[in-house]
């Protein structure tokens, strides 16, 4: 974590007073579960807190920037900005994916590149930063890391894998593509969905995500990787 602390200070001028908070923010549940005897804390509670402060800050930004937009339009914009694919992108932008501690099984299954894990990590970091430095420092970090991309709209550049999969399969004839939720796990504030995509009633691939739509996109992405 020494390298992470140096990076945060160099890139963002952030020095954590409570190093345990930072360490917890970068500890996935899979790592904590594999080291239960050490009683290691994981980042789910910090994620919960970070999600709340991020919702507030983005809501405030949108409210100020778009004084003529209705509540429904503002909600849609906020959802686009704080969805897991966007937050995972910001985690990668900050280099956070290199520092998260994962269990061996999660690491082997590609967890370090999984949007749901990296999106949660970004929120957990914000939660830890809030507790250590206060909301103004979180606000400054969000303004530096996120808002420039929000202004340019680059946070929206997420591939629609479902459409790509549909176009690929239908280029070979009529097919029936179906997405089914096969598993739900996690606490109410951090649900994780597993979705299976099938073609003509034959299972093709699976995906996971913090929402059903995100899990469907992940399943379609995995299916495309298999077919192409």
UniProtKB/Swiss-Prot annotation:
UniProt key word rRNA-binding: yes
CDD domains reported for this sequence: DSRM_RNAse_III_family, RIBOc
Reactions performed catalytically: Endonucleolytic cleavage to 5'-phosphomonoester
SUPFAM superfamilies, sorted: dsRNA-binding domain-like, RNase III domain-like
GO CC field: cytoplasm
Residues covered by the DRBM domain: 160-228
InterPro entries named among the record's database cross-references: dsRBD_dom, RNase_III, RNase_III_dom, RNase_III_sf
Localization in the cell: Cytoplasm
EC number from the UniProt entry: 3.1.26.3
Lineage top rank: taxon: Bacteria
Keywords attached to this entry: Cytoplasm, Endonuclease, Hydrolase, Magnesium, Metal-binding, mRNA processing, Nuclease, RNA-binding, rRNA processing, rRNA-binding, tRNA processing
The RNase III domain, residue ranges: 5-134
Binding locations of Mg(2+): 47, 120, 123
GO biological process: mRNA processing; regulation of gene expression; rRNA processing; tRNA processing
Cofactor(s), by name: Mg(2+)
Alphabetized GO MF terms: double-stranded RNA binding; metal ion binding; ribonuclease III activity; rRNA binding
Main location: cytoplasm
Active-site residues (renumbered): 51, 123
Pfam families (UniProt xref): dsrm (PF00035), Ribonucleas_3_3 (PF14622)
Oligomer and partners: Homodimer.
Role: Digests double-stranded RNA. Involved in the processing of primary rRNA transcript to yield the immediate precursors to the large and small rRNAs (23S and 16S). Processes some mRNAs, and tRNAs when they are encoded in the rRNA operon. Processes pre-crRNA and tracrRNA of type II CRISPR loci if present in the organism.
Family: Belongs to the ribonuclease III family.
Protein name (database record): Ribonuclease 3
Annotated organism of origin: Streptococcus agalactiae serotype V (strain ATCC BAA-611 / 2603 V/R)
Gene that specifies this protein: rnc
């Amino acid at each position: 974590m020494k390298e992470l602390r140096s990076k945060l200070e160099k890139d963002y001028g952030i020095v954590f007073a409570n190093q345990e908070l930072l360490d917890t923010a970068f500890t996935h549940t899979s790592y904590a579960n594999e080291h239960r005897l050490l009683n290691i804390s994981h980042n789910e509670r910090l994620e919960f807190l970070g999600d709340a402060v991020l919702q507030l800050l983005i809501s405030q930004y949108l409210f100020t920037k778009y004084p003529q937009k209705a509540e429904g339009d503002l909600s849609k914009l906020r959802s686009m900005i704080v969805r897991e694919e966007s937050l995972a992108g910001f985690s990668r932008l900050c280099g956070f994916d290199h520092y998260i501690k994962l269990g061996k099984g999660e690491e082997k299954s590609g967890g370090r590149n999984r949007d749901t894990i990296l999106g949660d990590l970004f929120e957990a970091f914000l939660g830890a930063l809030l507790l250590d430095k206060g909301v103004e420092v979180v606000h400054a970090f969000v303004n530096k890391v996120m808002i420039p991309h929000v202004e340019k709209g680059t946070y929206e550049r997420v591939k629609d894998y479902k459409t790509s999969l549909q176009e690929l399969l239908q280029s070979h004839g009529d097919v029936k593509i179906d997405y089914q939720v096969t598993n739900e796990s996690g606490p109410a504030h951090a649900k994780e969905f597993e979705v299976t995509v099938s073609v003509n009633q034959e299972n093709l691939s699976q995906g996971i995500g913090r929402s059903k739509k995100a899990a469907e996109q992940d399943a379609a992405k995995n299916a495309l990787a298999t077919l192409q």
